[in-house]
Amino acid sequence: MKGRQTILRVGEMALVGALVAGCLSGQRELGVPLSLTVRAAAAAEAARVVRVIDADTYIMQSGAATYRLRLLGVDAPEQDQAFGPQATDSVARLLAPGRVVLVARAGLDLYGRTLGAVLLPTATVAAAGRPVPLDSLLVVRGWAWACDPNRKVAAWAAQQTDAQRAGRGLWKCGASRAVTPKSWRSFDSEIKRRYRVGCTW
């Protein structure tokens, strides 16, 4: 058992090295502004996926520690919101239980969740042999809004504009029909019911 753990740790260290070496190139290839994902890469660590809670919140494990990670840089639809289940399913396909990814932690939020960035290995996403920041991938696929690290000011990046124009993901019904998670949480049950009628996946 001890030998198996040693082999696993060596493999995780190799993955960290490969991801850190390629993260800058991977982000530039997507045309993403250099953000937390790149700045924190040197301090990143290998982590195993335990489960996906929703499109931007996951249970992760690093060593013996298990923690809840809130993905920085994006805001994805709530589970009871239009396109929420589809966004979560899209992420769950990328973050299968037991998969090892690179996580750059950046403190805690008001709810005690760990804030951070996630880099996907090349075996998970085809990106010319380079790792891909999960936050950027969600925006490109239309499953999240791009936002700054403190989640207060929307950053209408080129990827989000392209996703809107192409009608990908939550933009299927047009930008005017998309409701941000923050607005959704403020709605009462009657308003939510009205928004659930009409355009669906």
Language-model features, listed with the residues they occupy:
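Small beta-barrel nucleic-acid-binding modules, primarily SNase/OB-fold domains
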Residues: 2-201
